[in-house]
Amino acid sequence: ARLGQGVLLNLNALVCHDCEVGDFVEISPGAILTGACSVGDFSFIGSGAVLKPGVTVGKHAIVAAGAVVTEDVPDNAMVAGVPAKLKKSV
């Protein structure tokens, strides 16, 4: 895994093999980034969220607490739910 500058990795958060996390990303408590995930700069991963293998989260994106991300998240998007769906652009 590679963590960028200024990443906030909270309690019990898990970043698995081959993940790339950009600069100034917040990964909330209990979030799980499974293998080969990518998170863009200035993004937020909510508590208990799960990113499935190979998922890419764009820059300035928000993943809500408890979301299960099974598809790529575009830049400047907010996703929520199980499975995660686009809720709005930010």
Q: Where would I find each of the regions flagged by the language model?
A:
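Structural signal for interior beta-strand "rungs" in well-ordered beta-sheet cores
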Residues: A1-A80, A84-K87
